Amino acid sequence: MQKLAAFLKRFHSGPAADACEFLGCHTREDGEGFVFRVWAPHAQSISVVGDFNFWNTEDLPMQKISEGVWEAVSVYAKTGQAYKYCVTGPDGRIVYKTDPYANRCCALPDTSSMIDPPDGFEWHDALYRARTAKQSAIKRPVNIYEVHAGSWKRHEDGSYLNYEELAAELVPYVKDMGYTHIELLPIMEYPYDPSWGYQITCYFAPTHRYGTPKQLMQFVDTCHKAGIGVILDWVPAHFPKDENGLFEFDGTCCYELSDPMMNEHPDWMTRIYDYGKPEVQSFLISNVCYWLRYFHVDGIRVDAVASMLYLDYNRRQFKPNKFGGRENLEAIEFLRRLNEAAFQANPAVMMIAEESTAFPLITKPDYDGGLGFLFKWNMGWMNDMLQYMSLDPLWRKGDHNALTFSMTYALSLIHIS
């Protein structure tokens, strides 16, 4: 109880990098059943429904144990069973929600969470991790193969390769081609099959499309034994408005900003996180630490950083910050805390910003006024190179500046091209 009380204090004052160790579904200390905890500060009531209670909304009501954290215990719940939270909002409307901290999700169209604790996998990558821990990635050769697991290769019937099949075919290919890392486009659970996975509905659950969480761990283990690092694309800039997801989780704007002028992304029609809330910071930061700890990933590429940094990003109207500027001060502070927590979890981690503007000091440490990333994705060089190669060869001689322009800013930050 003392550990829980200490966590709740950290969670509400923020950020708590270990939030995933307390929230979600966890095995009870005595090993009998599971405890469920969820953050929903404005909910009238919540109950846990699932296979273990025949989805009876009155069988397992949750109790509020702090400012917005609810808890329930079931001795009947078992690994592999599905569950959801039945949330009654302040207006009395009832919505069935996926657990934000769920470690696994059921196969679509079922949007239920599944009980599946992430521990218990036997790793064989100690030598690889010891070797990479000795030297920063800045001083090591890096050659990254970016891949979408669902479209790199498929079976003849169009079905996806699972993680075991990907490991058997992708890892030897990457090794033979001289790459040092595989970067996976988002493999967290997402709702729309034809997409690349950038609208995430469950951040702690690997998508069901390619196998189980343990099979993803096996994929990473196979990569490491072959000397290949694994980087994950990660999306803290926005989330979709699927009713079962984070969208208005407790019947109000819970994870997202409450201001209707600012809480929706104009390009993607998705919701934007409220980075000023300690509980939201804890959710996102603990998610990165979760992937580093339980899945042994070597790097995190943070997607759409520019959309986080600017309040007027692709907006005609916006509300300036307290100094009258366009910078999102809460997002800037969040990114600093994120990088600090990530490097505490794994000092050798590659924290990469996918940032498309000239925002200063992205790869400088916090104490130098920077954001604390290790690398910035060199989108400028990429766009210039693609533009140059798209020209008719006859006209390229007049556009050689596209090849050299990136050299004017190359030394201001640490780039990955």
Which residues does each predicted region cover?
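The feature marks proteins involved in alpha-glucan
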Residues: 1-35, 63-146, 151-158, 165
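Short proline/glycine-enriched turn/loop motifs at strand-loop junctions of beta-rich domains
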Residues: 39-46
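Short, acidic Ser/Thr/Gly-rich low-complexity loop/linker segments typical of extracellular
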Residues: 57-67, 376, 384
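Substrate-binding/active-site clefts of carbohydrate-active enzymes
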Residues: 126-141, 148-327
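Conserved alpha/beta catalytic core and glycan-binding cleft of carbohydrate-active enzymes
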Residues: 296-298, 313-417
